[in-house]
C-alpha cells in the first residue's frame, strides 16, 4: 500500500467516525420542542437535557435555548426558591451558553436575554420577600440572592450599577433588625446586642452609598433613641445601683448617638414636624431643657402656619 492509499484510508475512517458520532449523538431538539409545546415539560427535559450534556460539542445555540426555556418553565411550575434552586440555576446557564453561540438567531437571542432578566429578577424578588418577612439569621441568604441577581444583570449589561439597590437593601435590613429589637424577643441577651450592631452597620452602609437619604437618617436616629428608651423601661425594683448606673450610661450614649442623624435629617427637611419632635425629645432625654424647648417652639410656630 502506497502513501496516498494510506492517507485516503485514514480520511475515510475519519469520515465514518464523524458520521457515526453525528448519528448516535444526535440531539432531539425538535422532539423536545414538540413535548414542551404540549405542556409536557418534564418529558421534554428528560429527553433533551441528557442529550445536550453528553454531546456538548454538538449542541448549538438553538439546543441550549430550547433547554433554557424548558428549565425556566420547570422552575416556575415547581415553585422553587432558594439560592441553589436547581432548575433556575440550570436555566441561567443554558441561556448563557445559548448566547455564547454567534449562530443563535436574533429573535432567540433577544428572548434569551429577556428570560435571563426575568430569572435575575426572581432572585431579587425573593431577596426582598425575605427582608419583608425577616428572621434572624436570614441575612446571608438574602445577600447571596442579591449577588445572583447582580451577576446576571452585569452579564446582560456590563455597565450595570448596583449602588442604588444595594443602598436600599442595607436600609431595609437595618429597619428589619430595628423591628426585631422592638419585639423584645431577644431582650437583655447577647443576640440583642448583635442585632443592634447589625442595624447600625446597615444604616451606616446605606448612608455610605446614599448619604442624602432622609428616611435612612431619620430611621437611624429613631432606632438608636428607641433602644435607649427600652433600656430605661427595664429598670425595676430588682435593679441594683451598679446596674442602674450602667443602664443610664448606655442610654445617654444611645441618645447622644441618635442626635447627629436626626439633626442631619432635620437640616434636609426643616419643615417636617417629625424631625422637630425627634430633636425636642432627644434633647429632653439628655436633660438639655433649653434646646428641647427651642425645638418645641419651632414645632408650635410650624403648626400655626398650617
List each model region and its residues.
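Start-of-domain marker
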Residues: 26-89, 119
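Alpha-solenoid helical repeat scaffolds
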Residues: 42, 49, 89, 96, ...
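Flexible helix-coil transition and linker loops at the boundaries of alpha-helical arrays
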Residues: 52-62, 77, 97-116, 150-169, ...
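Terminal, low-structured helical/coil segments at or just beyond the last alpha-helical repeat
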Residues: 236-260, 264-306
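Bacterial Sec-dependent N-terminal signal peptides
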Residues: 1-37
